[in-house]
UniProtKB/Swiss-Prot annotation:
Acts as a chaperone. The keyword Zinc does not apply. Belongs to the heat shock protein 70 family. This is Chaperone protein DnaK. The keyword Glycosyltransferase does not apply. The modification Phosphothreonine is found at T199. GO terms for molecular function: ATP binding; ATP-dependent protein folding chaperone; unfolded protein binding. Pfam families: HSP70 (PF00012). Residues 600-635 are annotated as: Disordered. Gene3D superfamilies: 1.20.1270.10, 3.30.420.40, Actin, Chain A, domain 4 (3.90.640.10), Substrate Binding Domain Of DNAk, Chain A, domain 1 (2.60.34.10). The lineage of its organism: Bacteria, Pseudomonadati, Pseudomonadota, Gammaproteobacteria, Enterobacterales. It comes from Pectobacterium carotovorum subsp. carotovorum (strain PC1).
Length: 635
């Protein structure tokens, strides 16, 4: 069995880890970083950039640079949270034909899983470069409070990226695995507070150790899938925009370029204020009007930032109370508090969490890497590389069906350990009813339409009978990924209908297959582009070295030979301006052939001088390889 990699697909940053022997290793990407910005950009010349290269060009290409896509994955366009984002994001969020939230980039409609797949492809490539083998399987993490549609959309993203998603695992649970695996923790109850770039989760987890086997059992989970660092950034951006408007009378919200610069500066200032008491946000030439250029220079203190975001931090405390209540525990029974997610580096967050639990959070868990490490551990469990670890996760929200009077009747309660299966018998609401509609719901509200609709199907062919007589057995079966399978069976006739819930929204099989094909086509285009760049680099070096030799020993050549070399140089120079790799390679070969006379002229006699030239030639070869690698990294 091949390696199963662990991927933390984050809102702001993503990370990939593997089991390497007995150790878990977080891998560096082609830019040398252990985390990759979850940013995708589509350039004017048709190139797709992912990670740091995409982030670097965001200011000049705001409408085609996509970030925080995880906040849209598996969501409906009309969702309140999506509408909120649609008003502030520089890129265009649209309604798909099925009502999902999609994006429009350069007049092309794209689904969030399709875009997230680009990040997953980079994670896959990072692992392949390190291991030197093809990777096809992964464990991918999601916020614990993700619903069924969001989980399914994440699996779709994996498929589009060319990965078989062996397991979807909750982020706080993954962090608990990272924390508990290499420590002699004994039996402990821990709280994992996970405040990332776009989502917030709290999980109460019990770690038991019996005869060397560790069991990680999630007792309760809660959260908010639309609360994270992006919201903190927005508060800072709004403050800076308002201050600038007061000073200059100019509203930067109408200038996408200025807003992109401001977003970058706000995020940087927020990070700086975790270690400094104040910082300057200084953006010269932020905009201009008839009176000339305008400069933004605003001093922000840590106290000011805290006053802007305190309400957001307080919003995270309510789910803590609910999770403890659901677990049947008091604060004093929590032995360790683990902080996960970059936003937990903020001193105010750490203080509020410490005050709530009455103890300082642990500092020995890397908030950026713990989730990917846990995912890799789960991958190791599935592949058999990791023994003596058992993970018992839960479903975050209740699952049920709509019954008479528009009521939600739960079949599986929230915080039920998964995988699980539950059946319940229902009947008809009217006499001689020949069909029933099974409307599957997820949520905690009593009124059916206040919950998330996951889908519906009909069971027909029910034998005529008075209301209340037919026996319709509805079975809910949740797999280890937290994805739901529902069946309804008429016990009298034996007729049965089954569906795997993919939500009333989501991508259908045909759309996923098309996106997989598109991704494969892009991979081929990327490979051809890399080969073209390699040929250009070789051509450039050959031009440079040949011209240098021509200057040094050209006067020793016959006029015809010199003319032939000059012509070949011009032909190669012309080919390098084009896009035809075969043409470039042909001109390289032509120049190599005619420049043989140069080599003879520069090596009139064998010996030390010739050896030195050989060494120089070898160095030139090394340079070609190194530069090709560098260009490839930038892709």
């Amino acid at each position: 069995m091949g390696k199963i990699i662990g991927i933390d697909l984050g809102t702001t940053n993503s990370c990939v880890a593997i089991i390497d022997g007995t150790q878990v290793k977080v891998l560096e990407n082609s830019e040398g970083d252990r985390t990759t910005p979850s940013i995708i950009a589509y350039t004017q010349d048709g190139e797709t950039l992912v990670g740091q290269p995409a982030k670097r060009q965001a200011v000049t290409n705001p409408k085609n640079t996509l970030f925080a896509i995880k906040r849209l994955i598996g969501r409906r366009f009309k969702d309140e949270e999506v509408q909120r984002d649609a008003n502030i994001m520089p890129y265009k969020i649209i309604a798909a034909d099925n009502g999902d939230a999609w994006l429009e980039v350069k007049d092309q409609k794209m689904a969030p899983p399709q875009i997230s797949a680009e990040v997953l492809k980079k994670m896959k490539k990072t692992a392949e470069d390190y291991l030197g083998e093809t990777i096809s399987e992964a464990v991918i993490t999601v916020p614990a409070y993700f619903n069924d549609a969001q989980r399914q959309a994440t699996k779709d993203a994996g498929r589009i990226a060319g990965l078989e998603v062996k397991r979807i695992i909750n982020e706080p649970t993954a962090a608990a695995l990272a924390y508990g695996l290499d420590k002699e923790v004994g039996n402990r109850t821990i709280a994992v507070y996970d405040l990332g770039g776009g989502t917030f989760d709290i999980s109460i987890i019990e770690i038991d150790e019996v005869d060397g086997e560790k069991t990680f059992e999630v007792l309760a989970t809660n959260g908010d899938t639309h609360l994270g660092g992006e919201d903190f950034d927005s508060r800072m951006i709004n403050y800076l925009v308002d201050e600038f408007k007061k000073e200059q009378g100019f509203d930067l919200r109408n200038d996408p370029l200025a807003m992109q610069r401001l977003k970058e500066a706000a995020e940087k200032a927020k990070i700086e204020l975790s270690s400094a008491q104040q910082t300057d946000v200084n953006l010269p030439y932020i905009t201009a009007d008839a009176t000339g250029p305008k400069h933004l220079n605003i001093k922000v203190t840590r106290a000011k930032l805290e006053s802007l975001v305190e309400e957001l931090v307080n919003r995270s405390l309510e789910p803590l109370k609910v999770a403890l209540q659901d677990a049947g525990l008091s604060v004093s029974e929590i032995q360790d508090v683990i902080l996960v997610g970059g936003q937990t580096r903020m001193p105010l967050v750490q203080k509020k969490v410490a005050d709530f639990f009455g103890k300082e959070p642990r500092k020995d868990v890397n908030p950026d890497e713990a989730v990917a490490i846990g995912a890799a551990v789960q991958g190791g469990v599935l592949s058999g590389d990791v023994k003596d670890v058992l993970l018992l996760d839960v479903t975050p929200l209740s699952l049920g069906i709509e019954t008479m009077g528009g009521v939600m009747t739960a079949l599986i309660a929230k915080n039920t350990t998964i995988p699980t299966k539950h059946s319940q018998v229902f009947s008809t609401a009217e006499d001689n009813q020949s069909a029933v509609t099974i409307h599957v719901l997820q949520g905690e509200r009593k009124r059916a339409h206040d919950n998330k609709s996951l889908g519906q199907f009909n069971l027909d062919g029910i034998q005529a009978a008075p209301r209340g007589m037919p026996q319709i057995e509805v079975t809910f079966d949740i797999d280890a990924d937290g994805i739901l399978h529902v069946s309804a069976k008429d016990k009298n006739s034996g007729r049965e209908q089954k569906i795997t819930i993919k939500a009333s929204s989501g991508l259908n099989e045909e759309e996923i297959q098309k996106m997989v094909r598109d991704a494969e086509a892009n991979a081929e285009a990327d490979r051809k582009f890399e080969e073209l760049v390699q040929a250009r680099n070789q051509g450039d070096h050959l031009l440079h070295s040949t011209r240098k030799q021509l200057e040094e020993v050209g006067d020793k050549l016959a006029a015809d030979d010199k003319t032939a070399i000059d012509d070949a140089l011009k032909a190669l120079e012309s080919a390098l301006k084009g896009e035809d790799k075969a043409e470039i390679e042909a001109k390289i070969q032509a120049l190599v052939q005619v420049s043989g006379k140069l080599l003879e002229a520069s090596q009139p006699q064998p010996g030390a001088e010739g050896a030195a030239d050989d060494a120089s030639a070898r160095r030139d070869d090394d340079v070609v390889d190194a530069e090709f690698e560098e260009v490839k990294d930038k892709k």
